Swiss-Prot record:
One of its GO terms (cellular component) is cytosol. The gene is rsmA. Belongs to the class I-like SAM-binding methyltransferase superfamily. rRNA adenine N(6)-methyltransferase family. RsmA subfamily. One of its GO terms (molecular function) is RNA binding. Its main location: cytoplasm. This is Ribosomal RNA small subunit methyltransferase A.
Length: 275
């Protein structure tokens, strides 16, 4: 496989994190994993040169119910419009600032399916941005750096367990679906990739916790991950009775379950409300 940054006459741009999927066997496996069906509301993030876009359109799009796509590279937008016409509705702009809720069906029922080969240089901030629309989403299937996927699905007590693990596991059921080697791309990235499936918890399954407060606690806990929690959460010891919660501060951040972090955030919320 050539290391050239040019594919189909387009030069992959490093600032956009572009690596184009070219392995048709991998593409078929990804599409089968997604399982698109006619008439579904689906949005693709970063369609690139359309490697996934084409097979997705074949299976679900009609002129009345097109596939939606968010693309930042204006050179690619013109090519995609010319190739797919009315079967693809393109939204020019940065996915980090895009209002995905604007594409959801009216009402409270989740209706969106989101897919994409996400730019690896913005994957974590984009995943956090997408959390704000989780109540409108049926599922998400993303190609990501394998290391990121391993952190997303990591268990407590492992080195991969991180702030990203806690915040995403609080909101989604997640599963690593496929490994994708570098040679599946043009140009090949310097890392292995993987497909992850993310299914938001339904409202009745979600713990009653302010995600902002949860994020505050988790960020503090993982700020110095080699230190004990009695140090990283030291600022909260005068406010929260950790002993009453049964929360052992003689641990490191990666040894604490998602449910325990939620419990601390709930306690903090109650104290701030009372005070």
């Amino acid at each position: 496989m050539s290391n050239s940054r040019q594919h189909q006459g387009h030069f992959a741009r490093k600032r956009f994190g572009q690596n184009f999927l070219v392995d048709h066997g991998v593409i078929d496996s990804i599409v089968a994993t997604i399982g698109p069906a006619r008439g579904q509301r689906m949005v693709e993030i970063g369609p690139g040169l359309g490697a996934l876009t084409g097979p997705l359109i074949e299976r679900l799009a009609t002129p009345e119910s097109p596939l939606h796509a968010v693309e930042l590279d204006r050179d690619l937008i013109g090519r995609l419009q010319q190739r797919f016409g009315a079967l693809l509705e393109l939204h020019a702009g940065d996915a980090l600032a895009f209002d995905f809720r604007s594409l959801a069906a009216p009402g409270d029922k989740p209706s969106l399916r989101i897919v994409g080969n996400l730019p690896y240089n913005i994957s974590s901030p984009l995943l956090f941005h997408l959390m704000t629309f989780a109540d409108a989403v049926i599922d998400q299937h993303f190609m990501l750096q394998n290391e990121v996927v391993e952190r997303m699905v990591a268990e407590p007590g492992t080195k991969a367990f991180s702030r990203l693990s806690v915040m995403l596991q609080y909101r989604y059921v997640m599963e690593k679906m496929l490994d994708v080697p570098p040679e599946s791309f043009q140009p090949p990235p310097k890392v292995d990739s993987a497909i992850v499936r993310m299914i938001p918890y339904e409202p009745h399954e979600l713990p009653d916790v302010d995600p902002v407060l949860l994020g505050e606690i988790v960020t503090a806990a993982f700020s110095q991950r080699r230190k004990m929690l009695r140090n990283t959460l030291g600022d909260y010891r005068e406010t929260i009775d950790f002993d009453a919660l049964g929360f052992d501060l003689a641990r490191r951040a990666e040894d604490v379950s998602v449910a325990e972090y939620v419990g601390v955030a709930q306690a903090l919320a109650a104290l701030r409300k009372a005070g």
